[in-house]
Amino acid sequence: MHHASIRTANIHRAIAFYEQLGFTVSDRFTTGYTLACWMEGLNGRIELIQIPEPKPAPDAFGDEHYVGYYHLSFDLTEATTDLPTWLDSLKERFKEVAKDEPSQFQPLKVLLEPTQQAIGNNVYEVAFIADTDGLPLEFIRRMN
């Protein structure tokens, strides 16, 4: 896959959010009259597109009848040996930057604390957070 595209109400706030996850802006451009960029990190690439007159996104995580985009998933198997500790560190990082820049950052919204899940013959640690527009992001780490 080349990239996943995310529409955002505020591209500058979204860039700052994804930078805290380890992404960096690789290209900035416009699509028509809207601001856009590609960001690379966590072994993937995302595209952020600012929407001039945004409407609230559906609750893809909470509405079990919702059809469409559900979440992006990032494999942290190579990045950490302990997903709960990694997530706690991320929460602290967001808490600190929210103090310094309250207009740009909110405390990290955790949708699902780390839990173990068996999928096929593997056991994973899985956690979900929400991005700045409330879109669910999954972090997964293979344990075996």
Where is each model-derived feature located?
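Core segments of cupin and vicinal oxygen chelate
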Residues: R7-I46, P52
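Acetyl-CoA-dependent GNAT
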Residues: I51-E53, R142-M143
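Residue-level marker of positions within ordered structural domains that often coincide
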Residues: G44, T77, F139
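Vicinal oxygen chelate
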Residues: M1-N10, R28-T30, C37-E40, D59-N144
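A short, acidic/glycine-rich surface segment
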Residues: T34, E53-A60, E113
